[in-house]
Amino acid sequence: LYDLFREAWSELRREEYPDLFETVDEERAWGVESLELLANYFSVEDPRSFEPLDRELDMLEDLDGITIRGILDRMEEIDGRLVITDYKSGKAPPERYALPAFFALKIYALLIRRRTGRTPDAIRLIYLNGPTVYSIEVNDRQLDAMDRQLRALWSAIERALEREEFPPRPGRLCDWCSFQELCPAFGGENTPVPRAPASAAAS
């Protein structure tokens, strides 16, 4: 398995990512971490034991004027139940805080329902850094609520664009943000970007 990984990475590096790492040590550290994640995945399941309906499914759907696109990692049927799965390379949140992590998967479930007419029965997150697996049931009522939430979010984005109002929302993730010097929450000044002419925007 490790030999297959090294062979695949050598080919990708040569053809698509020749300048990804500045030093050999950086590449080696990344390789070691990647091999650990790969081993963790095989401790969760054996991919030879099932045949997914789809992998890396390109989801592009128009929800009555709201265009949504994403890549669904995996969809399969298990004992007559439709399950969609997303892989995460990071660490899993504590279980009591895990529900918000299903936000994107609920959107995928909504798109699958719209595309196929079938409601997924469950959505699953596999955190490879652990590993940890979280799974929850879904139904039409939940997906209807997600549809309303998406439309409300889209309306809020449109209002913010019209008013050019983007208030900061400080939180723990700010520690990793590269734009603190531009953020009012950290004493920065966010200079408005000139809008493109209507003709340019339309093209």
Can you say where each PLM-predicted feature lies in the sequence?
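Generic alpha-helical structural signal
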Residues: V32-L35, A39, K106, D144-S155
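Short amphipathic alpha-helical segments and their helix-coil junctions
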Residues: E16-Y17, I84, G90, L153-L161
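A non-catalytic, helix-rich entry segment at domain boundaries
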Residues: L1-R55
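Conserved helix-loop functional segments at active or binding sites
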Residues: S43-V44, Y87, R114, R163
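Short, mixed-charge aromatic SLiMs
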Residues: L1-E16, E61-D62, G130-I136, A201-S203
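Metal-dependent nuclease catalytic regions and adjoining charged, substrate-binding loops involved
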Residues: L111-S203
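Non-catalytic, well-ordered alpha-helical scaffold segments
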Residues: V32-L35, F102-K106, G171-D175, Q180
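Mg2+/Mn2+-dependent nuclease catalytic core
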Residues: L57-L150
